[in-house]
C-alpha cells in the first residue's frame, strides 16, 4: 500500500536556518506516522533551473506549462500529495522572492479551472503553514498568509489558520533551549496537520 505523500515547502533562502530546522522536524514527524515526505526548497528550485512565470498563458491555451523544468515536477508531486505544509520566514511583511516566484507558477493549476477541467479531488486536501519572524513586524502577517492560502486553494488544498512564530532573531533560534516552548507549538501544528492528512486518506 502506498504511503500518503506530504510535500513540505521550505520557503527560506537559508539552508540551515529556523525554517530548515522546522522542515526537518516535519519530515521526521511525517516519517514516524507512516507518511512519505519530501522537502522542497523554493530557493533551490527557483535558482537552479526553475523559471518564473512569464505570463505567456500557454497553460491556458494548451493545458501545459511552456517550461519543462523542476517546477513541472512539483506540479506532479502536488497532484499526488495528500497534504501540503508551508514553512516560510517573513520578508518585508511578505514571503521571500524565491517562494513568491514558485507560487506564481501555480498559474498552471488556475489554468485547469479556466479550461473547465474537473477537479481531481472531491474534498480539498489538508494544508498547514508555519510562519517564522525575527520580530514583531508592524504590518502583521496577512501578506504572508494570503499568497499561501491562494496557492493552496488553487492546487486543491485547504489551508488551516497558519501558526506564527515570532521573536526568532537568530538563524538557529528555534533550536535553543529558551525557545523550546515555541518549537513545541510548531510540533503541535505539525502533529495536527499529519492527523488531518491521515484522516483525509481514510
Regions picked out by a protein language model, each given a short descriptive name:
Residues 1-111, 172-202:
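N-terminal beta1-alpha1-beta2 submodule of the flavodoxin-like/Rossmannoid cofactor-binding fold
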Residues 24, 95, 117, 146-148, ...:
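Alpha-helix termini
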Residues 114-161:
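Short, glycine-/small-residue-rich phosphate/pyrophosphate-handling segment
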Residues 133-136, 168-172:
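A short, flexible beta-alpha/helix-coil linker loop
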Residues 160-169:
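Beta-strand-loop-alpha "switch" segments that mediate conformational coupling across diverse proteins
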Amino acid at each position: 500500500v502506498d504511503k500518503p505523500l506530504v510535500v513540505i515547502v521550505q520557503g527560506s533562502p537559508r539552508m540551515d536556518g529556523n525554517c530548515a530546522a522546522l522542515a526537518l522536524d516535519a519530515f521526521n514527524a511525517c516519517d514516524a506516522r507512516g507518511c512519505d515526505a519530501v522537502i522542497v526548497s523554493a530557493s533551490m528550485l527557483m535558482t537552479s533551473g526553475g523559471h518564473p512565470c512569464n505570463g505567456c498563458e500557454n497553460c491556458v491555451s494548451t493545458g501545459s506549462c511552456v517550461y519543462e523544468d523542476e517546477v513541472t515536477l512539483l506540479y506532479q508531486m502536488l497532484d499526488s500529495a495528500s497534504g501540503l505544509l508551508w514553512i516560510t520566514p517573513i520578508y518585508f511583511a511578505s514571503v521571500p522572492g524565491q517562494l513568491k516566484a514558485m507560487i506564481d507558477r501555480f498559474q498552471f493549476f488556475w489554468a485547469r479551472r479556466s479550461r473547465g477541467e474537473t477537479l481531481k479531488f472531491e474534498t480539498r486536501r489538508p494544508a498547514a503553514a508555519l510562519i517564522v519572524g525575527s520580530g514583531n513586524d508592524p504590518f502583521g502577517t496577512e501578506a504572508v498568509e494570503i499568497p499561501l492560502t491562494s496557492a493552496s486553494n488553487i492546487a486543491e488544498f485547504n489551508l488551516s489558520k497558519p501558526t506564527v512564530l515570532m521573536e526568532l532573531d537568530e538563524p538557529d533560534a528555534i533550536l535553543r533551549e529558551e525557545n523550546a516552548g515555541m518549537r513545541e507549538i510548531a510540533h503541535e501544528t505539525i502533529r495536527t496537520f499529519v492527523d488531518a492528512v491521515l484522516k483525509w486518506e481514510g
